[in-house]
């Protein structure tokens, strides 16, 4: 029984978000860590993410049944009813937002709510099914966790938080396009208009390369504005350039497109994990305090 209630929350997505929210929190803490606040932020946001995923599974039952990758989800194979998944998601969301509201600040809660509404309301219910821009809309919600972590610790939205939001939003694009390429048949069967399906793999390749290049530029803004040190700059440039070189290999004659897309996808995870860990460790002790919107 417990297993299906865990599976419906997409634990892999939760774990990925744990790393980014912790990275944002440690970056903003600048060595002065409130461990109770950190724990409450991580648990609270994890529950909010779990809630969104459970409700996403409830809404997506029809298209999940058409995709090889998702047809065995508990909401599709009958192990869990849609009603149970929905109310499970509601309970998790209430607890998660309650924790964030009690322990953090209105800025962090507002961004968590923004991400939730975008993911469940805009992305899941409309853009994923109807628009090629669904990936971009989804990327907005996917970029929220590190910003929530940052704002929970800093008590404000500043240039550092803005850079994190932009950086993680851009990162989502090549990451998601790569998935859409090697899962092309699934998305086509479900009628989901992701870029490779609706406008072709060639265009998706170009977008992957452009977004990786943009990601490298935005990631460099954190050290250039004084939020992190040279160590982050080195890791950011090394991983971004390697990722870009990997993406450019997609133009080699006779390339196995699915294999190439999987490599781009897996390295995207390595890149964002490396940067999340590095920004947690290589912070500057004094914040530049640029573009400040305080919580108090």
UniProtKB/Swiss-Prot annotation:
Catalysed reactions, as listed in the record: heme b + (2E,6E)-farnesyl diphosphate + H2O = Fe(II)-heme o + diphosphate
Entry similarity comment: Belongs to the UbiA prenyltransferase family. Protoheme IX farnesyltransferase subfamily.
Protein known as: Protoheme IX farnesyltransferase
A GO CC annotation given for this chain: plasma membrane
InterPro entries on file: Protohaem_IX_farnesylTrfase, UbiA_prenyltransferase, UbiA_prenylTrfase_CS, UbiA_sf
Pfam families: UbiA
GO BP: heme O biosynthetic process
Encoding gene per record: cyoE
């Amino acid at each position: 029984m417990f297993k299906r209630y865990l599976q419906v929350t997409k634990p892999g997505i939760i774990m990925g978000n744990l790393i980014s929210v912790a990275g944002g929190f440690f970056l903003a803490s600048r060595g002065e860590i409130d461990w109770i606040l950190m724990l409450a932020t991580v648990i609270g946001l994890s529950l909010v993410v779990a809630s969104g995923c459970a409700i996403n599974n409830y809404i997506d039952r029809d298209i999940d049944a058409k995709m090889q990758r998702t047809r065995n989800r508990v909401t599709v194979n009958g192990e869990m009813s849609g009603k149970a998944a929905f109310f499970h998601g509601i309970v998790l969301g209430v607890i998660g937002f309650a924790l964030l509201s009690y322990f953090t600040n209105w800025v962090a809660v507002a961004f968590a709510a923004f991400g939730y509404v975008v993911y469940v309301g805009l992305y899941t219910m409309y853009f994923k099914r109807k628009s090629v821009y669904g990936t971009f809309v989804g990327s907005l919600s996917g970029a929220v966790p590190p910003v929530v972590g940052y704002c929970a610790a800093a008590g404000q939205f500043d240039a550092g938080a803005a850079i994190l939001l932009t950086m993680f939003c851009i990162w989502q694009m090549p990451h998601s396009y790569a998935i859409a390429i090697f899962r092309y048949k699934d998305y086509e069967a479900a009628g989901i208009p992701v870029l490779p399906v609706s406008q072709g793999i060639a265009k998706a390749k170009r977008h992957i390369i452009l977004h990786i290049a943009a990601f490298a530029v935005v990631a460099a803004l954190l050290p250039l504005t004084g939020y992190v040190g040279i160590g982050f700059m080195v890791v950011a440039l090394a991983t971004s350039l390697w990722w870009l070189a990997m993406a450019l290999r997609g133009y080699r004659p006779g390339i196995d497109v699915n294999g190439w897309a999987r490599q781009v996808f897996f390295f995207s995870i390595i890149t964002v994990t490396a940067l999340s860990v590095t920004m947690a460790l290589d912070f500057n002790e004094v914040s530049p305090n640029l573009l400040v919107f305080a919580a108090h």
